[in-house]
């Protein structure tokens, strides 16, 4: 296993909610990342992020590791939730907040 995969695994394991995105939550660099961050932020939970534009090694390796080709990618409790479309669908159904709230139950 290469060092980048280990780094990704460590990030996912050490952050109950993490999004791999283009840009930052305050300054997204693409519309999909902006929409995803807005939905996640609306749930009222803190989350970590990794800017894949500033981390080209992660941008290259994460799609292979996750078997998910695009960004953003939302991970909750070590599980890939999905990209922008799935995040927005869960948000619109009211299920994103429930999914993210699982972190409270598992970490208490």
From Swiss-Prot:
Keyword Iron-sulfur carried by entry: yes
Residues reported in the UniProt entry to bind glutathione: 22, 59, 71, 84-85
PROSITE patterns hit by this protein: GLUTAREDOXIN_2 (PS51354)
GO molecular function, one term: 2 iron, 2 sulfur cluster binding
NCBIfam families xref list: Grx4 family monothiol glutaredoxin
Described purpose of this protein according to its UniProt entry: Monothiol glutaredoxin involved in the biogenesis of iron-sulfur clusters.
Name of the protein described by the UniProt record: Glutaredoxin 4
Organism, as annotated: Buchnera aphidicola subsp. Baizongia pistaciae (strain Bp)
Lineage, opening ranks: Bacteria, Pseudomonadati, Pseudomonadota, Gammaproteobacteria, Enterobacterales
């Amino acid at each position: 296993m290469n060092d980048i995969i280990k780094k990704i695994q460590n990030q996912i394991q050490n952050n109950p909610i993490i999004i791999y995105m283009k840009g930052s939550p305050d300054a997204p660099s693409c519309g999909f990342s902006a929409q995803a961050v807005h939905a996640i932020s609306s749930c009222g939970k803190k989350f970590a992020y990794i800017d894949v534009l500033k981390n080209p090694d992660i941008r290259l390796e994460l799609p292979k590791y996750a078997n998910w080709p695009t960004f953003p990618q939302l991970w909750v409790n070590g599980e890939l939730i999905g990209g922008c479309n799935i995040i927005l669908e869960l948000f619109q159904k009211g299920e994103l907040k429930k999914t993210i709230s699982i972190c409270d139950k598992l970490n208490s």
